[in-house]
């Protein structure tokens, strides 16, 4: 007789998305570096969502390894995504105000792409998924902007400005992880004030004290290493 299990198996789930506009698809795909036939440099590469997710996952791994610079990057990323979400809502509210030009009695159905880009998404950090959700919000916003321009609710220049403002929110988030560099020093190195720590601080600058002590932290970061934080508190207390 088989032994009865008293625990459930691991939860499994899959995130799938549909992108309807070329603007959102461009933000997903980015652009590879282009080489000209004459050997000169062509267009520079542009980061897309897969590269962003890869870098965000690496930052999360470095945070798990107790690197305070990674914790600072996680906190910055969370703040940028939160701010971008608020700004996206403001853009949507502005578009809604423009759409009030349409008189009562006029019904406009939701625009649907004849063919969508269907994707399965995986991120090693919740912040990655939050950025994907922001991209989905931009895709829906872009659909409505294009529709408003088609029906003459907004002008061509307004369409250009609105789409540019929305896409810029995603690109600024991409840029925050593009600037990240692994430092390779941990809180234990800080507690010991060893050569690894001093070299890292010279190269990357000292991390924020509140982040170092775990007082400021992204809500989506791995748990802070309490043992190393306790050692750091003792070190700073002794140095007073």
Q: For each predicted feature, which ranges?
A:
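Polar/charged low-complexity regulatory segments
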Residues: 1-134, 140, 147, 166-240
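Short, hydrophobic/aromatic alpha-helical segments in well-folded domains
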Residues: 144-145, 162
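Short, solvent-exposed positions on alpha-helices
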Residues: 157-158
């Amino acid at each position: 007789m088989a032994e009865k299990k008293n625990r459930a198996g691991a939860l499994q789930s899959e995130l799938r998305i549909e992108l309807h506009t070329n603007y959102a698809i461009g933000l997903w795909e980015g652009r590879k570096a282009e080489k000209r036939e004459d050997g000169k440099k062509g267009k520079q590469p542009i980061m897309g969502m897969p590269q962003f997710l890869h870098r965000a996952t690496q930052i999360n791994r470095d945070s798990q390894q107790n690197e305070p610079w990674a914790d600072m990057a996680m906190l910055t990323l969370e703040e940028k995504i939160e701010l971008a979400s608020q700004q996206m809502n403001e853009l949507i509210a502005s578009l809604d105000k423009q759409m009030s030009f349409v008189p009562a009695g006029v019904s406009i159905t939701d625009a649907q792409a004849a063919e969508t880009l269907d994707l399965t998404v995986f991120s090693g950090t919740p912040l990655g998924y939050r950025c994907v959700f922001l991209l989905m919000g931009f895709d829906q916003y872009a659909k409505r902007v294009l529709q408003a321009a088609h029906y003459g609710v907004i002008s061509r220049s307004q369409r250009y400005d609105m789409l540019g403002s929305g896409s810029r929110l995603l690109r600024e988030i991409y840029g925050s992880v593009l600037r990240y560099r692994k430092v390779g020093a941990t809180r234990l190195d800080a507690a010991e004030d060893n050569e690894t720590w001093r070299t890292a601080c010279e190269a990357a600058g000292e991390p924020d004290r509140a982040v170092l002590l775990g007082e400021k932290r992204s809500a989506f970061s791995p748990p802070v290493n309490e043992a190393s934080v306790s050692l750091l508190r003792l070190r700073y207390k002794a140095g007073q």
